[in-house]
Amino acid sequence: MKPSDVRSKAFAMPLTSPAFPMGPYRFVDREFVIITYRTDPERLRAVVPEPLQIAEPLVHYEFIRMADSTGFGDYTESGQVIPVEYNGQAGGYTLAMYLDDHPPIAGGRELWGFPKKLASPTLHVNTDHILGTLDYGKVRVATGTMGYKHKELDLDEQMKRLAGPNFLLKIIPHVDGSARVCELVRYYLQDIKMKGAWTGPASLELAPHALAPVADLPVLEIVEARHIVADLTLGLGEVVYDYLAQ
């Protein structure tokens, strides 16, 4: 294979059978349970990278069911998103996500810089409530419950919330172990079609784990819970801050 062939085909590894396809990445009937809670502000400051700023000491704990996604297939994801501001623009910073499917792990890390790790999350209706769980190995590190469709939410308002900016810290090492890429990336969810949004009573329990430290941001108070179903496209990102150029 000639160098020009390598350049023309280079998108993802392995070269001859990439771990994930080119986009666009469309999700149909993507289901979210988002439990917002108040936590320790000092612990938040210790994990949120500047120039992002914390507005309130809140965390969105998310369970996401994605049964129909372009190129990525059928999978479930769980993790923590922190409300932040960047140059006065409100958005969400993804601290860590845990999922059970290799293509979105590889694609998420390599394309956008999603901090994804392999684990075993679930999300399903359990009689009269929605149950979300996250197991890392044999340890249950997160359990979330929410009353099933107790009260409808305004779809336009929820769509605006989903359409806001999201931020990631993309890190790719050089072959010598030093940082080759260290960037703050911004991306958006696009072409959103809302199919339903509800709220209700919720609970969230987090347990300590050395390699899935969701409990490092402790639950002090449940502030809000949302159950959302939507079709959407995961837009590609843009670099807003290069740490290596500073």
From Swiss-Prot:
Catalyzed reactions: acetoacetate + H(+) = acetone + CO2
GO molecular function: acetoacetate decarboxylase activity
Keywords from the named record: Decarboxylase, Lyase, Schiff base
Residues at the active site: 116 (schiff-base intermediate with acetoacetate)
Top-rank taxon, per record: Bacteria
SUPFAM superfamilies reported for this sequence: Acetoacetate decarboxylase-like
This enzyme's EC code(s): 4.1.1.4
Enzyme class (EC, first level): lyase
Family statement: Belongs to the ADC family.
Chain's role: Catalyzes the conversion of acetoacetate to acetone and carbon dioxide.
NCBIfam families per record: PRK02265.1 (NF002614)
Protein name per UniProt: Acetoacetate decarboxylase
Originating organism: Burkholderia vietnamiensis (strain G4 / LMG 22486)
